[in-house]
């Protein structure tokens, strides 16, 4: 790294705030460019039967990657192609059903200009995003989106700062407008984010994490209280379910109920579980979202739920299962 002498009188905080002010003013100018061309771009992308192919060089390319990713995760299939690679074979990734969104602040990116005749020959719709509608790219575009800003936040006027922020925001405006047009939902978003926290919350169902079969702590109504306590200890879920031979739920007994029994002075060896159980028990269907089941647990101040179809016991889920699955 090159070394420089610290300039006298430099106020880092003031410099940072000045950048924010300049970029805020630049973004405020974008409002005038959300116009008929913007609507035409949205309509074209909405009706596109292929994908949106985003292109850009340098900093515009980095911003283009983010715009393509935002499109893809909000219901608009998209990917990024580097213009330099496109002119050496990657142009074959683009089909006549696609739309190209080309980004260049100046509108004079040589790498993109080289591709335009080929795109035109294939009748591929070209949307250009630049600061100059009269630029070569602006004139060649089927639709031009202006991202002109008064000044860069860089005091030298060289490093792309305000202009790249404006480009990113215009991309967000397109993506969100299309999201609304598609009626895109949280569930749709989760389908493309199954590995994230939101995906787990919106996709994971109780049936995916519940204990089933021999993992379920159960005893018959004729069992002794002592046998029920042994079952609670063996299965380590903090409860046992009292069921008949057909696994129909008769009641539930938890470690919290045990404290109540001790206070009552009941004989553990002679008492029947049916005499001290809580009838019913809080139940949820197997298709309920895990996050909704967790909310129910928290609202009822309990740590486990029965999973059932009516009176038929299907499984048990504990708060710890939620933690392991990353729902919390």
From Swiss-Prot:
Zn(2+) binds at residue 82. The record marks 59, 111, 152, 193 as: Catalytically relevant. InterPro entries: CBS_dom, CBS_dom_sf, GutQ/KpsF_isomerases, KdsD/KpsF-type, SIS_dom, SIS_dom_sf, SIS_Kpsf. PROSITE patterns: CBS, SIS. It is an enzyme of class 5 (isomerase). Pathway: Carbohydrate biosynthesis; 3-deoxy-D-manno-octulosonate biosynthesis; 3-deoxy-D-manno-octulosonate from D-ribulose 5-phosphate: step 1/3; Bacterial outer membrane biogenesis; lipopolysaccharide biosynthesis. It catalyses: D-arabinose 5-phosphate = D-ribulose 5-phosphate. GO terms for biological process: lipopolysaccharide biosynthetic process. Residues 41-184 form the SIS domain. Keywords: Carbohydrate metabolism, CBS domain, Isomerase, Lipopolysaccharide biosynthesis, Metal-binding, Repeat, Zinc. The keyword Lyase does not apply. GO terms for molecular function: arabinose-5-phosphate isomerase activity; carbohydrate derivative binding; metal ion binding. It comes from the Bacteria. Substrate binds at residues 75-76, 82, 88, 114-123, 148-150, 275. The keyword Hydrolase does not apply. SUPFAM superfamilies: SIS domain (SSF53697). Belongs to the SIS family. GutQ/KpsF subfamily. Involved in the biosynthesis of 3-deoxy-D-manno-octulosonate (KDO), a unique 8-carbon sugar component of lipopolysaccharides (LPSs). Catalyzes the reversible aldol-ketol isomerization between D-ribulose 5-phosphate (Ru5P) and D-arabinose 5-phosphate (A5P). NCBIfam families: kpsF (TIGR00393), PRK10892.1 (NF008141). Homotetramer. This is Arabinose 5-phosphate isomerase KdsD. It comes from Yersinia pestis.
């Amino acid at each position: 790294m090159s070394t420089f002498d610290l300039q006298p009188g430099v106020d880092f905080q003031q410099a940072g705030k000045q950048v924010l002010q300049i970029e805020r003013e630049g973004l405020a100018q974008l409002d005038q460019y959300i116009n008929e061309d913007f609507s035409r771009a949205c309509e074209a992308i909405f009706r596109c039967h292929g994908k949106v192919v985003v292109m850009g060089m340098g900093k515009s390319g980095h911003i283009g990657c983010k715009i393509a990713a935002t499109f893809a995760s909000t219901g608009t299939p998209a990917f990024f192609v580097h213009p330099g690679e496109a002119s050496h074979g990657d142009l074959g990734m683009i089909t006549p059903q696609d739309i190209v969104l080309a980004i260049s602040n100046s509108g004079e990116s040589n790498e993109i200009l080289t591709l335009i005749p080929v795109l035109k020959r294939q009748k591929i719709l070209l949307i250009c995003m630049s600061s100059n509608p009269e630029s070569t790219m602006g004139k060649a575009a089927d639709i031009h989106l202006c991202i002109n800003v008064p000044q860069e936040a860089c005091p030298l006027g060289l490093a792309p700062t305000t202009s790249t922020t404006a480009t990113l925001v215009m991309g967000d405006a397109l993506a969100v407008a299309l999201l609304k047009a598609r009626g895109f939902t949280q569930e749709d978003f989760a389908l493309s984010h199954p590995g994230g926290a939101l995906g787990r919350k919106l996709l994971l169902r109780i049936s995916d994490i519940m204990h089933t079969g021999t993992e379920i702590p159960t005893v018959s109504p004729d069992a002794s209280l002592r046998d029920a306590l042994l079952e609670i200890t063996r299965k380590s879920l903090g409860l046992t379910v009292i069921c008949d031979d057909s696994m129909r739920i008769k009641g539930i007994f938890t470690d919290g109920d045990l404290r109540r029994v001790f206070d009552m002075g009941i004989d553990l060896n002679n008492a029947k579980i049916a005499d001290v159980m809580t009838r019913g028990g809080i139940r949820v269907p197997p298709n309920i979202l895990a996050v909704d089941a967790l909310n129910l647990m928290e609202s009822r101040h309990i740590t486990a739920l029965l999973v059932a179809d009516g009176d038929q016991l299907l499984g048990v889920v504990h708060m710890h299962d939620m933690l392991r699955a990353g729902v919390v």
